[in-house]
Amino acid sequence: MVGSASSTEREKGFLDVIAQFPEIKILSEDKYSGATRDTAYSASQNILNRYGDELDGIFMPNESSTNGMLLALRSIGRADGDVKFVGFDGGDQNVQGVISGDLQGIIIQDPFKMGYSAVSLMVQHLAGKSVEKRVDTGATLVTPYNLKNENIQKLLFPPLEEYIDKK
């Protein structure tokens, strides 16, 4: 797997869990889709051309790959829920994909919590206190059913005015 560490870890986590379901056949797990929506679109078209009707579900590990696959599915008329599709990261196009039903879900994180935890742990570490080697800051599955939830809306569209010093 080539790409960013976060995408690689997301892919590994996905594959580790899917391995617990032997009835699910993985058709492709080693296709790097590139760092942009355009390269992801091209790679996604190749996957769709190669596997066509064999595809029942798709997971993409980051915003650009999710965007590219969404465009590719739309271009062949299969973005109607025919292929179950879950991607990672928010962003306007992914949120619109959930609203339209073209994406069954997106997994999002809490960037404020991630940043706050990182700084807090670094301060503790520099003060000589022991800290956990690994900290899970959580992830949330966003679907058409919970998209309008207030907490999810804050994760998708952070109220920056609450965090930015207005001096």
Residue ranges and their predicted role:
Residues 1-9, 60-63:
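Extracytoplasmic "Venus flytrap"
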Residues 91-104, 153:
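Flexible loop/hinge segments that line or gate small-molecule binding clefts
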